[in-house]
Regions:
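Active-site neighborhood of glycoside hydrolase catalytic domains
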Residues: 172-259, 265-271, 276, 282-289
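Active-site mouth loops of central-metabolism enzymes
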Residues: 42-56, 170-180, 364-367
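Sec-dependent signal peptide cleavage junction
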Residues: 19-31
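Flexible, acidic glycine-rich loops studded with aromatic residues
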Residues: 63, 254-257, 268-371
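Aromatic- and acidic-residue-enriched carbohydrate-binding clefts of CAZyme catalytic domains
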Residues: 34-39, 78-129, 143-179, 212
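Bacterial N-terminal signal peptides that target proteins for export
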Residues: 2-11
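Catalytic domains of carbohydrate-active enzymes, especially glycoside hydrolases
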Residues: 56-80
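Hydrophobic faces of well-ordered beta-strands that scaffold small-molecule active sites
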Residues: 41-45, 70-74, 133-137, 204-206, ...
């Protein structure tokens, strides 16, 4: 194994069971009509920072298939890697790629990716298990891997969408004020809308977290960017999902209300007591869960304190694992969005679900064992 530590996908099953239990308990607390549809329950899986082969992703689907209204959100791109085939940036199986060890490898970047055939097979498999598979393409930030590929394979287009030289976020943020940048992202989405079609529900997550370093009072250019992509996805038969942390209070009235918000943190971090500039700006300018609900949005609870997990040496320590589970069960429910503040929204009527999120920052050289 080359001294790599191994974790099994089945280790997440216990966490999933606890999440589903907590959501079911919240049904009573929320005083919902029993005839209403139960909240969606799912997993968001980061396959960019930590790549998972298709056979492993199927095991997550198997785990989720035990629960009604379940979904698996694939975080397919981030700064570290574009984990799927993408002709728009020149990452394809028929050019600059080799198939080895059961996966495709980009010979330009030396990074693995799922082919479109892999993705279509996963969608078909998820559909057979009554699990909805949701694509997420991170934009307009967290795009370093995509920009690196574009710079190599289409330098003219790279120049058209990048931020001006000297901009601190040029390495991972496109200039979303430009029509060319919006068209570029739309083209990437268009590669995958046909592949994820034909499911019981059609969702597409467009990212939109951590745009620029600090939240701002208002951002009309971001509103235009998001609404344009939402309108495009609607015409393709999809409901748009996006992260919450750059939705400004001042802009609530002008965002399309059919966008569903996956809410992780108002302050853009995990420490509810943080007083740094980003947290302070978030409290001042970013809409809270309650404000989003009051404005007419539907929310999914992705609370970054309780439902975020980072597989790796620290997480799999028995005492850490036990504390995480016990804390989740004792202190979280569907109404609690803002980290471990204990603050609850007044009603969960438009809280349509929740997810555990598995991020790859700490996975390091951990390998994944197939069951």
């Amino acid at each position: 194994m080359n001294n790599r530590k191994v974790f099994s996908v089945c280790a997440v099953v216990g966490i999933v069971v606890f999440l589903m239990t907590m959501i079911n308990q919240t049904e009573v607390k929320a005083e919902k009509n029993l005839t209403q549809i139960l909240p969606e329950k799912g997993i968001a899986l980061d396959i960019s920072r930590k790549f998972y082969k298709a056979e492993v992703i199927k095991q997550f689907i198997d785990d989720l298939s035990n629960y009604p209204n379940s979904f698996l959100q694939l975080h397919m791109s981030d700064n570290q890697n574009l984990a799927v085939e993408m002709a728009t940036v020149g990452q394809t199986t028929d050019k600059n790629a080799v198939y080895q060890d059961g996966q495709w490898l980009n010979t330009q970047t030396k990074r693995p990716f799922l082919s479109k055939n892999d993705v279509m097979d996963l969608v078909s498999y998820a559909r057979s298990k009554n699990v909805v598979l949701i694509p997420e393409i991170e934009a307009p930030a967290h795009m370093q891997a995509i920009l690196e590929l574009l710079k190599i394979n289409d330098p003219k287009r790279y120049e058209a969408i990048k931020l001006p030289d000297g901009a601190p976020e040029q390495f991972n943020l496109i200039d979303y004020t430009k029509v060319e940048a919006i068209d570029f992202v739309q083209e990437m989405l268009a590669e995958y809308t046909p592949l994820f079609a034909g499911q019981a529900k059609a969702y597409f997550h467009i990212g939109v977290d951590e745009i620029d370093w600090l939240p701002v009072e208002s951002n009309s250019n971001l509103v235009n960017y998001v609404n344009t992509l939402d309108n495009f996805l609607k015409h393709q038969g999809y409901t748009t999902r996006m992260w919450n942390d750059r939705v400004a209070k001042a802009d609530l009235a002008v965002y399309n209300k059919d966008i569903q918000i996956t809410y992780w943190s108002q302050i853009g971090g995990w420490d509810i007591n943080s007083t740094d500039e980003r947290a302070s700006s978030g409290r001042q300018y970013t809409a809270s869960a309650q404000e989003l609900l009051d404005a007419g949005f539907q929310l999914l609870n992705y609370n970054a304190y309780y439902t975020y997990f980072l597989p790796g040496q620290r997480m799999w320590q028995p005492e850490s694992y036990a504390y995480t589970i016990n804390d989740l069960v004792a202190n979280w429910d569907l109404s609690k969005f803002e980290l471990n503040s204990g603050k609850q929204v007044s009603s969960t009527e438009n809280v349509i679900g929740s997810a555990l999120t598995f991020w790859g920052e700490e996975a390091g050289n951990y390998a994944v064992k197939s069951n």
